[in-house]
């Protein structure tokens, strides 16, 4: 489906952005999150310049995204290592089973 114009409010300013209808709720949640971050920053830093607040919020969000990407990379690497270890364990068990079968002459079919 094609994007449709949506009006949102960011820190007291109206913005019209194009958004697919199925992503409208997510856009509104993102706008609410950004508004909350800007309000929190304004209180915490006592910065009143909106442009400066927006840049600080953007840096914070970018930092959080970078951290999450690193976590995802680390998790994926950990899972790959566990899968390799599991695969080696299974292969070794199959080899050992084959050796046991050869020694005893049993067949597990």
Curated annotation (Swiss-Prot):
Annotated keywords: Cell cycle, Cell division, Coiled coil, Cytoplasm, Septation
Gene Ontology biological process terms, A to Z: division septum assembly; FtsZ-dependent cytokinesis; septin ring assembly
Family matches, as InterPro entries: Cell_div_ZapA-like, Cell_div_ZapA-like_sf, Cell_div_ZapA_eubact, Cell_div_ZapA_N
Coarse class of the protein's main subcellular location: cytoplasm
Location of this chain's protein in the cell: Cytoplasm
Pfam families tied to this protein: ZapA
GO cellular-component term (any): cell septum
Coiled-coil zones: 21-97
Oligomeric form and interacting partners: Homodimer. Interacts with FtsZ.
Similarity section: Belongs to the ZapA family. Type 1 subfamily.
Function: Activator of cell division through the inhibition of FtsZ GTPase activity, therefore promoting FtsZ assembly into bundles of protofilaments necessary for the formation of the division Z ring. It is recruited early at mid-cell but it is not essential for cell division.
Record NCBIfam families: PRK10972.1
Protein name per UniProt: Cell division protein ZapA
Source organism of this protein record: Citrobacter koseri (strain ATCC BAA-895 / CDC 4225-83 / SGSC4696)
Chain's gene name: zapA
